[in-house]
Amino acid sequence: MTVVDIKIGNKYRIGRKIGSGSFGQIYLGLNTVNGEQVAVKLEPLKARHHQLEYEFRVYNILKGNIGIPTIRWFGVTNSYNAMVMDLLGPSLEDLFCYCGRKFTLKTVLLLADQLISRIEYVHSKSFLHRDIKPDNFLMKKHSNVVTMIDFGLAKKYRDFKTHVHIPYRDNKNLTGTARYASINTHIGIEQSRRDDLESLGYVLLYFCRGSLPWQGLQADTKEQKYQRIRDTKIGTPLEVLCKGLPEEFITYMCYTRQLSFTEKPNYAYLRKLFRDLLIRKGYQYDYVFDWMILKYQKRAAAAAAASATAPPQVTSPMVSQTQPVNPITPNYSSIPLPAERNPKTPQSFSTNIVQCASPSPLPLSFRSPVPNKDYEYIPSSLQPQYSAQLRRVLDEEPAP
């Protein structure tokens, strides 16, 4: 029996492979009862290390947050452990490539705000992610919400009840992705909250720069390659790494690198660092990312090309032939949502890499630095005073 012949939980049919996680393969799935598309992660029972059940348990602990996918089903079917979850949109790595392997500063700042919040939430549940990279952040379909995935390498760093931190250890093997690993991870120190945030710093710099200095290094063995990456990472001054970027990026990297092993990061401070930069640069917190603009421009160009090649229309002699044509003025805050697909017609997960690219017409919530206060995002066209509201939020001090 092949994978595509397997029926999961008596109602999910498996389609083609759409990706891989730290452990297991991911397939497109279809709910045969209501036609809803899902993602199915499979792990062979004969695998040397069984991690999928562990990942399922982590998801169960993290469930309920806006940036965590919902698990629909978990169990054993045929010769596989199987986990059925939300089908999400493209990853930030996919969108980065779609945008020519570089994001504008505005997009990086908008992403940073959500990514810091996702990491903070996972840490608040006593877990480290330990594999922070663009591939593990996906956009929700038809939404502007960044979702965090792949908790196969996640680790509990403190006791759930007492919050006693795990002890400091060294001589640890590198866990995660070497390109974004913290310096302490490279030198074998047990990971803690600071390492997730340092890894995020490298992700943000990757988005701004287009690449990192230690990419593409060659070596005979994996260990030698990791050593070259480590040496380059340690030997690259932050002034060089952040050259041409606002000083906030150096501040962020210095802060995360100077945290002690058990120290709780000030997530609100880091968010405010980038939010203040967003305001100082005059950007709107409007959830309009680079891929939305690029998608709009491509659609406008295609429409203009189609119009130019269309046969001329016969017009009435009473109508002036010299009437001016209004130019296309992009209104990125009102890009229409993609047409709803027929849920009974399975389509490729990557049929349109920017299915999530249109800003939602519905209000979106974002977490303020003030505990127990949620503020709704309203598109700038509906609430011009939003920037003033954001400033008011940032002026409030977080509770101790």
Swiss-Prot record:
One GO cellular component, as annotated: growing cell tip
GO MF, any single term: ATP binding
UniProt region (Disordered), positions on chain: 330-352
Catalyses which reaction(s): L-seryl-[protein] + ATP = O-phospho-L-seryl-[protein] + ADP + H(+); L-threonyl-[protein] + ATP = O-phospho-L-threonyl-[protein] + ADP + H(+)
Record keywords: ATP-binding, DNA damage, DNA repair, Kinase, Nucleotide-binding, Nucleus, Serine/threonine-protein kinase, Transferase
Gene Ontology biological-process annotations: DNA repair; endocytosis; homologous chromosome segregation; meiotic sister chromatid arm separation; negative regulation of ergosterol biosynthetic process; negative regulation of transcription by RNA polymerase II; positive regulation of double-strand break repair; regulation of DNA repair
Record carries keyword Nucleus: yes
Pfam families referenced in this protein's UniProt entry, alphabetically: Pkinase
UniProt subcellular location: Nucleus
EC number: 2.7.11.1
SMART domains for this protein: S_TKc (SM00220)
Top enzyme category: transferase
Residue stretches making up the Protein kinase domain: 12-278
Protein residues bound to ATP: I18, G19, S20, G21, S22, F23, G24, Q25, I26, K41
Stored Gene3D superfamilies: Transferase(Phosphotransferase) domain 1
Active-site residue list: D131 (proton acceptor)
Job description of the protein: Involved in DNA repair. May regulate the activity of protein(s) involved in double strand break repair caused by gamma rays.
Sequence similarity: Belongs to the protein kinase superfamily. CK1 Ser/Thr protein kinase family. Casein kinase I subfamily.
The name this protein goes by in its record: Casein kinase I homolog hhp2
Organism name: Schizosaccharomyces pombe (strain 972 / ATCC 24843)
